[in-house]
Amino acid sequence: MANMKDVKRRIKSVESTMQITKAMQLVASSKMRKAKERAEAVHPFFEGVFQVMADISRDHEFTSVFTKKKFKNSVLLIVIAGDRGLAGGFNTNVLKLAKAKADAITESGGEAVIMAIGKKAVEYFEKREYKLIDGFPQIAEGIELIDAMMIANKVIERFKIGDFDAVELVYTTFVSVMTQEPQHLRILPVENLEYLGQKHPMTIYDPSPEEVFDSLIPEYMGGMLYSAIVDSFASEQAARRTAMESASDNANEMIEKLSLLYNRARQAQITQEITEISSASLNDNS
């Protein structure tokens, strides 16, 4: 027979844990909504930047250091993960993709260089034999556009002097509250812009299309990084919300089972006491 005091203590412990998981679920939901709002707020500006760059890149005579394809001797992987755990497979999935991309670069004879954004990404690559050149833990929740621009300018300067032949991004994109998908994309050299928007043949760029294009690269890079970091943060919160919702449901199910166990133990105890009283009464009468 289960010890009633132990079962009661266990029920209280699980109830306390469920209060925590429900609170974390609510906090994650709130942070997820705010992150989505931040991403949507800057979208029109960056859409305009991309459209101008796309318009310039359609000119067959146009050339820029930021569009020239090179042999990929050295590739910078900017890896964005979370700052905390308790988010299901969020961190594991994006870091698994990043590792696969880094290993593929190495196996093809190139060098994979890592820039990690998020505490989990920094910790992951610090513990492994990868070339980690920079780390930015715990910046995602409060990141401003100026922070993303600062990181972007660091990358741009090193790309211009030839430290990297390509810059690629690994992060998690928000599909829905229930679905978040790890993504990999090339951001430098810039490619495939010619497929965006409409051609504007009467547009004249001063001082030159090349200079205008190159001057927009910091906004382009900053926008890509800012959007990816905010998107990743929203994905992290969605994954945490789902994980905490599942934990709360499991805790509630456990409480129901423990309560049933407690009630059965209590019923058995009462039955035993009645039996003992009845037996004592019969003995007295005899």
Curated annotation (Swiss-Prot):
GO terms for molecular function: ATP binding; proton-transporting ATP synthase activity, rotational mechanism. Keywords: ATP synthesis, Cell membrane, CF(1), Hydrogen ion transport, Ion transport, Membrane, Transport. It is found in: Cell membrane. Pfam families: ATP-synt. Disulfide bonds: none annotated. Coiled coil: none annotated. One of its GO terms (cellular component) is proton-transporting ATP synthase complex. One of its GO terms (biological process) is proton motive force-driven plasma membrane ATP synthesis. Its main location: membrane. The keyword Cell membrane applies. It is a peripheral membrane protein. The keyword Membrane applies. F-type ATPases have 2 components, CF(1) - the catalytic core - and CF(0) - the membrane proton channel. CF(1) has five subunits: alpha(3), beta(3), gamma(1), delta(1), epsilon(1). CF(0) has three main subunits: a, b and c. Produces ATP from ADP in the presence of a proton gradient across the membrane. The gamma chain is believed to be important in regulating ATPase activity and the flow of protons through the CF(0) complex. Belongs to the ATPase gamma chain family. This is ATP synthase gamma chain. It comes from Ruminococcus albus (strain ATCC 27210 / DSM 20455 / JCM 14654 / NCDO 2250 / 7). The gene is atpG.
